[in-house]
Amino acid sequence: MNHLIFLQSIMNLRGVGRKKSYAIVNQLQLDKSVNVSENEFIEQFSSIKEFKLYKIEINELRQCIDAAKRIFDEHAKNNISSVAFFENDFPKKLLEIKDPPVLLFYKGNISKLNNANGIAVVGARKPSLNSYDVSNSYAQIIAENNLGIISGLAKGCDTAAHKGALEKKGFTVAVMPCSLDDESIYPKENIDLFHAILEEDN
């Protein structure tokens, strides 16, 4: 059981969110080198205060491990990669926010998030034609100045910004609130844009 399954198992536990996950990771001194059996994981987790505090049963812990394995099995089928907050590839700026994620799931070249500067674009999902054109034009200018465009692949201004960056062969990042398999991508009308971003090795 590697560090990613270990972390996801913790995140699956009842009453354990991101902040508690960070505390548990620190207590267990978890890092990328961890490779333990299910029984070793249960033994380690049983030794910390959260286990007693939330009155978590052993069978519940096993269910969380099984659920984590299913997640990563599905990710493997869909070429979805993962990175933990303590790994070098994890976006450093993301660690500066108040409540950073413990795990990040991604497709494409995540190293660009650490090696290049970017500008976030947020706008209306139903913009006027002028607003759409402005978002697209600004994104092109930003891309021409070697800055990335970070947006959410939503309809409207997000779409315009991603397309503007791609038109100038710039890099763009789509931050998604859903899984990254084709069936889950939303909105469906942006599935081609999603793949265009990946094809540019972004």
Name what the model sees in each region.
Residues 1-136, 140:
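Short, positively charged patches
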Residues 85-202:
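Glycine-biased, small-residue-rich flexible motifs in mid-sequence functional cores and linkers
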